[in-house]
Amino acid sequence: MEQRQYILDLVRRELTDTPQTQDLQKLTERIISLEKTITQLGTLLLGPNSTTAHEVSSLATAMQKVLYYNRAKAAISDFIMAIPRYPLYSYYGNDDIDDYHLAVVNRKPILPQFRYLGLMFGKPATGIQPYNFEVSFNLSKVEQTLISELAPTESQVIEDMRRDSTMLLKAEGRYDKSLNVFTVLITIITSNKLIYSQRLNIPGHRVASFELMIIANAVHTTVFEPAKVTKLPSCELGTSSIMSTTFEIRVQDMSTLPSPAFHARTIQSIKKTWRNADFSTGQLSAEDATYEPKMSGAEDVVIPHVYGLAESCEILTISDVYESVYNFESLCYCYSKKSGMEMAVRMMMLALELMRDDYKQVNSIYDVDHQTSESVGILAGITEGLLANAKAIALLVKHAVLSEELQINLNSIEQSYSRLVPLVPIYVTFDHVGTYSKGDAPIRDEPFSLTGLQLPMFAEGLSNSTIKTKFKSTWSVEPNVFGADHTIDCYESDDFIVLLKPKFAYWDHRYSHQPVSAVSYSDRGKSRTSYVLDCASSYNEESSLGYTSLFLAGRKAASPCALVNIPLNRSVKFESVSFLITSKRSVLPISGENLFGEIDMYIGRVRGTLNCNKFTSTEYIDRDGYKRYGLIGKCTGGSLLNASLSPLWVRLFCGGHKNADQIRFIGFSRTPVVGTLSGESLEVYPMPGSIGSSGTLSQSGRMSIYNDVTSLEVTLSVRHEASLETANVYAQSEIPGAALSTEIRDYIRQQNLYYSDLGLREEEAMIQGAVVMRTTFRGKLYVTKGTDSIPQSVYVWNTQLNDLAVAVKMTADLANAAEIRSKENQFRLNEMEQAVREIENQLLLSGIIDGLAALTGPATPVVKKAASLVFGAMKNMSRSGFRILAAGLTNSYFKTVMTHFLGTRKGVEVWRGLGSACAESSVMIKMSGKTKPIVKEGSTDLFLADKNFILADPIEFAKHNISTKYGGNVEQIGNVVSDSERLAVGGDLGSHVVTVFHRPLSILPEPLRTLLFKLSTSGLSKRDLSAREAWIRQTLHPTHSYATISYDYVLPKTGGNRRVLCFAGVGDPNPYNLPTGDKNVGIGSYMVEFDIIGLDKDTGVKVMRPVPWKQCGYTEEQVWSIYKTLGKEYRKVELKPYTVEDAWRVIAKSSHKRVLSDKAIISTPISYERQRAIEYMLSSHGFDYNLVLNNCQDFTRGLFDYARGGPVPDFIENDVRIAMIHSTSRHFAEVCSWVGV
């Protein structure tokens, strides 16, 4: 046995150690040197017709192929070394969480299961004796932990001296002749406990022998481990005797497909004959034998397919000793049909058993000399082991992982489109200086420049004063804000993907144009000169020295008198471009030779090429999060590399405004002192395709006066945040209209009209996108491909962390995220505390009144007095449940739950019911006189209905459930309870909230609709909730009303939060091209989702980013429909969109503005079931509009009442009501757990 183990260890070490070229060379040479011996051994064991005997030379060739493809040696080593020796736990996504719990908690798939494998039928057997046997094997630490945790706690204790690390399998067989039944009792003992017991009754068989095999010790086991051999007792069958052997093997999956066989009861006898058999030579194989069973009936039955030594349910007959040897040979033949590592291990063990333990029997059969048999047996065992493992290697080389040479000659004209973000210059500076003194040459010699036009007429309006004016415009943007890395898809096939990863840079934009004429105005009749400066801002601050106040009244529209264009060769360019080709199927890094790639493409409006010829290996994470192996190189050639990609226009405005006759001025003292002014203004410059935001302009001026010479410097700087819409930076000096002639003023007016309508074209202000016209790639790649025949878990094992570590980290991250969320909730507690008190006060009193009313009948003064007393005594106590729950979110109990119970079914149930049990039960116990209530069937607990229970806010859910379920009781005792306030919630809560909005009527003229709206809603925000509730029940206000449904949910993949904002109203925007407007009929609704990317530190309000329209479930046609039905009042400030992405950006931005600008009248929480019903209600679209009896305000009032637990609105038809119930029921059946409901 020790020598056999040594051989096994030798072969495994020879194979599984990280194979270097020298080791593989030695192994190949050894196989080639033993080729003759292996051929003889194969012929001896498997017969002359066996394919193994003829494949020895091909095996050597395969090994040489391994050497030729030196990359395959790493793949083979990784594959073999990646076979785990312990059970693995697979990583499960959110959708498979139930499967995960089943795999972890359910004992049945994990505890060992045992089956009888093969039954050898033969002649009537007599005297079958009872027998016992046992098999023991060691357990790993992981297996010990699993079994100890999952074994039944009531397991019987067995007095056994074995160690805890050993599992003992016992089988006791007894034959009941009267019943013709052979009974086998199988037991499993570990850690001195009986953890498994199974009784097998085998009826109708005259059993000669049977075998047992352990299937798997854990459901995720993925390894074939070396077999352990156990001898079964001999069974006497008349004059024949057979020694059978069982192999205890661990396997991964067991086929459940049955194979046909004959029932033993129908067999009378079996005749085995040989075709052309020559018993003298001993050269017989299973192919030469035929079996002819004689049946007692025509009944065919199915016996489960067996696993183990025979791998088939072959019927074997035993007539004498020689025949049993040939039967053994038949088993060998069956083995030759095995594949992979299983075949190698079993063949090796079979050879060792045959040649070491039974060599005398073999010698007697094949007449081998006794003196050489032992050495031959040992040598044969070694060579057989090498042969089996060589087969395994050859199989891997052929079917599993192999480095291949791919000669690529790609020349694709398939076009690929990528959309890029706007590109904004990092640093731009302009200096414009003009100096004019008394007596200088006429100004007409230094004319204005206006987009190439000469304006000599300006000279007529200039005064004789001397002014030196310097205009400086600076635009500075952080490098990491714009021009970030992009990925451009160029080509994709079944095998590889070609990508470009550009990084953009900007020229140093410094452009000077001299001279730019500056003009001044001098009133000779006054003692001081007036100068006019307009920086497009509005401020009123004193100078730093306090001599003179600087005043600029209001803001005015700027218009250009000079437009400065940055030349095309001084704008955006590529700083670097990476050429990336990734393989879809490679399981190891790839390399290549003689590679060249080129892309012909448009970037913005410029077309050119980029090419690369030097590549290195890399790893790339694609958009789906999968790791790909590939090659990357920097583009070093091509016409696009140094080309200007986008012309950037910056305007310098000098003089003029739409009302040129208007005089604005800044006055300051002529005293020779220095003054400083500064101020800020908010400028918004919309640009198509950009992300909605704005920049802040800061201006400062420095003025000094010496000897009637004015030096004025104006500096404008732009400070940008994360995203901008600013497209232009300018400085402007203003000329009083009186200083210019009528002709000049008329000309400026014309130019103003022209430039006021002239905006930057989109393609000039930004790089709209990239279009790949042609992709060229050629060269040789060495790719190590995988195959579908190898489980994906093998590759995962090679490229990812241990699954158990991933699960632990996932749990830790989840706990951290939940704790962060709970801390987030702390800032809400102060806001919600009053609302919680209101709910508890109402519900507590409601329950008490209901209980007293049941005893005393109608409400009487006695009942009222008793209610007030009880209410006062229990008011403070009722808040304890919520306070405990709030504290539990961040204190030790929360951490204990997350740390010890998350991931188990028990822990999930505890956490799901934590908020509901703590809050709702606490209130209900007090309401019902300390008798725990029974929740009625059909009511829905949001904790059970919401999948994302871990990161949801349990306080809000409990609050909403209670309010919706029992809120009706408050109305029923309204005559008793004097406090009729309702719950107040804001639109920034995480759970489902319905809010009613009102806005001015768009069909009325602007002054009238604003006036009526103010009069109608005046002072409403200061009224209490009951007054607002009464206000919305009056449905004849001169306003338009709509409602929103808002809630948060958690993204399972990222753990981030997402806000859903659904708008609903009569005649509101919709994705179905339904008519809109204040008087149109039909229910319009649409939904926008936002990713919550943070919380404002000062206000606690959520900072959100729109989700792409495809992720919101819309088609392109539906997006355009929503955009067209938005209404001019919501998109009047937006430029016309060019693409569907632009339209969706306008929709998201306008939707967000709606909830900020329109007036929110009242809000209420809504339970999960009613929110689902409202979703179906909105899909009906039908509404019988009537200005007086059934208008938009009736619609929102009905929606609000239904959200608060009221009846279905009257405008909903009966068939829609029925469909609502069915839709909600189906949804609950899909997502809800009704345990305990």
From Swiss-Prot:
Pfam families: Peptidase_C97. InterPro entries: PPPDE_dom (IPR008580). Its main location: virion. The keyword Nucleotide-binding does not apply. GO terms for cellular component: viral outer capsid. PROSITE patterns: PPPDE (PS51858). Residues 1006-1222 form the PPPDE domain. GO terms for molecular function: peptidase activity. The active site is at H1040, C1192. It is found in: Virion. Keywords: Capsid protein, Outer capsid protein, Virion. The keyword Zinc-finger does not apply. This is Structural protein VP1.
